[in-house]
Amino acid sequence: MSQTTFPKNFYWGAAVAANQCEGAWNVDGKSPSIADCLTLGAVDTPRKITLDIDTERYLYPSHRAVDFYHHYKEDIKLMADMGLKMFRMSINCTRIYPTGDESEPNEAGLQFYEDIFRELKK
């Protein structure tokens, strides 16, 4: 069996989905997305979409996730320390346009993503 190595100029990277990493599901003007209404499931417990968010009865994984919203600087530093050169992320629409009916975007949401992009450029 031969060993395969990556070339020295190989670009390592990471990717995340906003609803799986950000948390802060109701912070700074963000309103719930369908992912925020999706409950935790298990092998014997199917996930549910609840019309009303009921935190007394269900756990919602997207509500905290890995809390990238509050820890993106540390997370980006960890990725840089690991030598990652690429980062793909999605943007949560309900952080920018909370209900989808706004004529102007949510400034706090825009600022959050701008801050991430500035941190990535360091």
Where are these regions (language model features)?
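Non-catalytic accessory regions flanking glycosidase/transglycosidase catalytic cores in CAZymes
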Residues: M1-K122
